[in-house]
């Protein structure tokens, strides 16, 4: 930045100097008015007058000099000078040199070209690239000394590491494979959700193999000029051939690898020409021995079939969400850089974070460290990890948001309705936490934490989720009446309706329609799908689908109403606990559902200075009472969040 500033300052100074040199030269001596000059001529004090246009350089008889200018054309001036015996010398007007004339005439054009080059360099990222280097590859090469990542830094995806381990062996000892006539896959496509470690795994391959590593994003190929994408692909593979054996890593390849001939661009756009060139380079007339192309995407369904055939991306490696053992390994990797308390158990944290990706777990460790730093602690304990988990799962607390007592009470009944239904319907995830502290965009949150990694869901579980989603709205309706039900259940209704429609149209849970697929194809144009949508059902079938969805929701809605009606005492008690503690966890919910006295949450401080402890400071044993009334097991399911 400093070098560019100095360069532009030097250019500005040079231009100013050039323009000053082209300007009229300054006359020597002082300047006097024209009337004084005429008086001195009449008084015979002038010896010589040099006339150059309107400028007169005067030399007096006492050798003093000055300059004056003729304001208007004076035809009598020459006669007057000759009469007084003044030596008159005529000088031709100054004309610019040929070089100056050329410069002045071409300067505007040169200035425009210079500005255009400047902006093109900025668009190309500046640096040492020329203004016309659009076709040069933007791939960045990392040498083996720059890549410090190894397989030891990658955890939670053992199967994926095994899949790519032979790539490392080939890059280390290619002769061992070539002797037996074996060919290593030319391309490996890593597929998986965001944040699962696809890019990290590619870097680990390069770090283990100790070979040059070219990295580029799929969006770096295509820009504003036609032909740039294909040119960059050619240049990238030319660089890779010089550095072979090497690895080319293309992140988010779906940016250029989408299916051809579909979408709004028809079959002839710049992206498709880039893809065509990539297909040729990967497996065309000329081979690329020693070059392994690794690509990553979370949308393999939109890629062109020619890109996925053997000879190009021979192998697809699925990098999925880690299981509980994988999450434990990932947490241990990220915990290396954090000072931990003695109570930290990565296995417990892993069991409490189902569905977390590697990036989510890294964020969890970082958030826990930040919580510890805010509390001026020297180590990170389980308390900070619990706070970090709640923040990631439910959103940050908004304690500054002012709520009236009536709003807090309505929110407490709403969240209590979710929790009670979720606790009493079969096959539902356990209630982890209920809070009426605003988090994120929600006024309150009821969070259900699965006991394990969910692979599939039964019909009963799905219907239980629908009942739980309507628990909040039903609690408001029972307590306040239909006229005073709030809009807080809008997201619950949306999730429940989509869930019921999927059960009917995709998962075959309708006796009337049977196990058939009725859902329409949902592909956006920009993802390489067709613009037109095909309708796969008649109007009569669509009407039956709507009836089945409504019947499914009404059945679970009525079941949830009956559960709350039978357990009104628990609903009121949970509301009171939420109004007092604001947040309750599983132990408090257990007490409420068993109709016992509620123990205070861990770390809760009574503003009145009293608590539920004996003289030794330990909580008193809860008082057992009757069990809640549960309905007969029926068909049932529930969403993770019931937000107010």
Curated annotation (Swiss-Prot):
Name listed for the protein in its UniProt record: ATP-dependent zinc metalloprotease FtsH
EC code: 3.4.24.-
Bias (Polar residues) ranges: 608-619, 632-644
Molecular-function GO term, any one: ATP-dependent peptidase activity
Keyword Repeat applies: no
One GO biological process term: protein catabolic process
Binding site for Zn(2+): 414, 418, 492
Residues at which ATP binds: 192-199
Gene that specifies this protein: ftsH
Key words of the record: ATP-binding, Cell inner membrane, Cell membrane, Hydrolase, Membrane, Metal-binding, Metalloprotease, Nucleotide-binding, Protease, Transmembrane, Transmembrane helix, Zinc
Region (Disordered): 599-644
Quaternary state and interactors: Homohexamer.
Family annotation (SMART domains): AAA
Family: In the central section; belongs to the AAA ATPase family.
């Amino acid at each position: 930045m400093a070098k560019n500033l100095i360069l532009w300052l030097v250019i500005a100074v040079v231009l100013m100097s050039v323009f000053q040199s082209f300007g009229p030269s300054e006359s020597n001596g002082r300047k006097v008015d024209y009337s004084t000059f005429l008086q001195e001529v009449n008084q015979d004090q002038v010896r010589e007058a040099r006339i150059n246009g309107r400028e007169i350089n005067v030399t007096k008889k006492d050798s003093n000099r000055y300059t004056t200018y003729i304001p208007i054309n004076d035809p009598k001036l020459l006669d007057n000078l000759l009469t007084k015996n003044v030596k008159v010398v005529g000088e031709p007007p100054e004309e610019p040199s040929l070089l100056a004339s050329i410069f002045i005439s071409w300067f505007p054009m040169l200035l425009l070209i210079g500005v255009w080059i400047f902006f093109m360099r900025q668009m190309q990222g500046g640096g040492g690239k020329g203004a016309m280097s659009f076709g040069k590859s933007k791939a960045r090469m990392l040498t083996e000394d720059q890549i410090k990542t190894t397989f030891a830094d990658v955890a939670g995806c053992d199967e994926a590491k095994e899949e790519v381990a032979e790539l490392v062996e080939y890059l280390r000892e290619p002769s061992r494979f070539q002797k037996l006539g074996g060919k290593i896959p030319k391309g490996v496509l890593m597929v998986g959700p965001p944040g699962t470690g696809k890019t990290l795994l590619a870097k680990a391959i390069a770090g283990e193999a100790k070979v040059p590593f070219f990295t580029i994003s799929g969006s770096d190929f295509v820009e504003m000029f036609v032909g740039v994408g294909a040119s960059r692909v050619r240049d990238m593979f030319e660089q890779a051939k010089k550095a072979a054996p090497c690895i080319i890593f293309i992140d988010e390849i779906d940016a250029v690898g989408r299916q051809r001939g579909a979408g709004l661009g028809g079959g002839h756009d710049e992206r498709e020409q880039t893809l065509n060139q990539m297909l040729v380079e990967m497996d065309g007339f000329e081979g690329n021995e020693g070059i392994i192309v690794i690509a990553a995407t979370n949308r393999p369904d939109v890629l062109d079939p020619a890109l996925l055939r053997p000879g190009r991306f021979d192998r697809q490696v699925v990098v999925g969400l880690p299981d509980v053992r994988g999450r434990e390994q990932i947490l241990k990797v990220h915990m290396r850089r954090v000072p931990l308390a003695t109570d930290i158990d990565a296995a417990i944290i892993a069991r409490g974070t189902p569905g977390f990706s590697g990036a989510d777990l890294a964020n969890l460790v970082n958030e826990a460290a930040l919580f510890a730093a805010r509390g001026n602690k020297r180590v990170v304990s389980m308390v900070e990890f619990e706070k970090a988990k709640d923040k990631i799962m439910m959103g940050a607390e908004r304690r500054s948001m002012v709520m009236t007592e009536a709003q807090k009470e309505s929110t407490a009944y709403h969240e209590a309705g979710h929790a009670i239904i979720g606790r009493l319907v079969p096959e539902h995830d356990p209630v982890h936490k209920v809070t009426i502290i605003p988090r994120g965009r929600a006024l309150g949150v009821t969070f259900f934490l699965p006991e394990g990694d969910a692979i599939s869901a039964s019909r009963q579980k799905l219907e239980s989720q629908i009942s739980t989603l309507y628990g909040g709205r039903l609690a408001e309706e029972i307590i306040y009446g239909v006229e005073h039900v709030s809009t807080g259940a809008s997201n619950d209704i949306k999730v429940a309706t989509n869930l019921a429609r999927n059960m009917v149209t995709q998962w075959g849970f309708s006796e009337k329609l049977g196990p058939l697929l009725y859902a329409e194809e949902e592909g956006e144009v920009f993802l390489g799908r067709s613009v037109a949508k095909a309708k796969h059902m008649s109007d009569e079938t669509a009407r039956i689908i709507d009836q089945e969805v409504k019947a499914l929701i009404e059945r679970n809605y009525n079941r949830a109403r009956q559960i709350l009606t039978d357990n009104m005492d628990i609903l009121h008690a949970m509301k009171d606990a939420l109004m007092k503690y604001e947040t309750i966890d599983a132990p408090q919910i257990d007490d409420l559902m068993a109709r016992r006295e509620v123990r205070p949450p861990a770390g809760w401080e009574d503003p009145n200075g009293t608590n539920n402890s004996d003289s030794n400071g330990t909580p008193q044993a809860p008082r057992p009472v009757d069990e809640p009334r549960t309905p007969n097991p029926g068909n049932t399911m529930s969403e993770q969040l019931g937000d107010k």
